[in-house]
Amino acid sequence: METDEMNYEILKNATKSLKEHGKFIFTTLNGLFPLYHSVEEFHDAGSVEGNATCRSNTFDLMTFRDYNITEVEDDDGNKKELKCNERYYVPSEISWLLKTLGYIKIEIFGAKLGAYSRNDKLTSEDFEMLVVAEK
């Protein structure tokens, strides 16, 4: 979302929907990744004709937000331009947010697209992180 407050509200509402000892499993952008890599180069490397493309990337180290313009083409050939604002989180932030919401067990792993596993330790090479939290 556009603000950290909006993201917190999403986490809070998801938490309210869980039963006691329920698990909340999600992925989020890994804040360690842009400290060691260019987000723009990452998007360019994954660019495939027919898929969305990103341009005008700027990463703000003070807010850990990536601002970019994403262009997509729908099935009818109509081009759309989206002004994006994406938040990256470091593990300590996610842990603190979840502890604030009452989670007792929080695990964070590296997220490999389509092959999520608790065996993957989170590193700066992972674009996303897998979070498993229990109330």
Where are the regions a protein language model picked out?
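A short, flexible beta-alpha/helix-coil linker loop
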Residues: M1, G77, L113-G114
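Surface-exposed cleft-lining segments at the edges of enzyme active sites
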Residues: M1-E5, E81
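Short glycine-/acidic-enriched loop or helix-start segments at secondary-structure transitions
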Residues: T3, L35-H37, R118
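Short, glycine/charged-enriched secondary-structure capping and boundary segments
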Residues: E5-Y8, V39-F42, T123
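A short glycine-rich, Lys/Arg-flanked "PGG" loop and its adjoining helix->strand segment in the class I
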Residues: M6-K23
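Short, ordered coil/turn segments that flank beta-strands lining enzyme active or ligand-binding pockets
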Residues: E20, D75, S124
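SAM-dependent methyltransferase
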Residues: I25-W96
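C-terminal lobe and adjacent flexible extensions of AdoMet/dcAdoMet transferase-like proteins
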Residues: Y88-K135
